[in-house]
């Protein structure tokens, strides 16, 4: 399989070890190479980037799925964290698969992109079922957002154990806020 990898952060430059991968570092180059090279799949990495750049990558996904030359090519989004609204926007753009990269304090080793083959659990709709529908996000600055609980009228900041072990898993189905959301203050 031939892969086109778009990584605007440049972090995957030294990590990809496959002759079947073409690496680009901008959405425009990605769209251009997708039309020229006709890869089997486009892998788009959403790293630690500005929110504006994240929006540009989501727009790229939509352009790939709407372009007559590229709409049949599978798109796989690699996210560094679980983010419900990003996954929803990717679904709306036509992305089929989302995979979450493990966060690690150690530098990442080489990635063989041929092992990024999506599994049924990576389907966008499956990932959305896992994430609590009340996850909301409030912009802090041009690069960061804080996660808040919509079931608690966006007044509770989420993080740590609650976010990772309840809100971002099927555990949200037993959450007291999910089961009894506040309607008004």
Functional labels for PLM-detected ranges:
Residues 1-9, 16:
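Conserved acidic segment of CheY-like receiver
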Residues 2, 72-76:
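Proline-centered loop/turn at the N-terminus of a beta-strand
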Residues 8, 23-26, 79-112:
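Output/docking surface of receiver
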Residues 17-19, 71, 92-95:
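Short, structured coil segments at secondary-structure junctions
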Residues 40-66, 79-80, 86:
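Conserved phosphotransfer microenvironments
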Residues 107-185:
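Cysteine-centered metal-binding/redox modules
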């Amino acid at each position: 399989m031939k892969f086109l990898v778009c990584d605007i952060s440049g972090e995957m430059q030294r990590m990809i070890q496959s002759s079947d991968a073409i690496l680009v570092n901008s959405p425009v180059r990605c769209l251009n190479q997708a039309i020229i090279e006709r890869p089997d799949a486009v892998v788009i990495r959403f790293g630690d980037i500005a929110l504006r750049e994240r929006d540009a990558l989501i727009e790229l996904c939509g352009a790939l799925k709407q372009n007559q030359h590229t709409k049949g090519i599978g798109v796989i989004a690699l996210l560094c964290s679980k983010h419900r609204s990003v996954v929803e926007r990717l679904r709306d753009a036509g992305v089929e698969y989302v995979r979450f990269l493990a966060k690690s304090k150690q530098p990442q080793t080489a990635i063989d992109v041929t092992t990024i083959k999506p599994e049924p659990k990576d389907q966008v709709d499956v990932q959305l079922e896992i994430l609590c529908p009340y996850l909301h996000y409030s912009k802090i600055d041009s690069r960061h957002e804080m996660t808040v609980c919509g079931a608690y009228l966006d007044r509770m900041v989420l993080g740590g154990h609650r976010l990772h072990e309840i809100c971002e898993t099927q555990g949200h189905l037993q959450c007291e806020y999910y089961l009894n959301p506040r309607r008004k203050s």
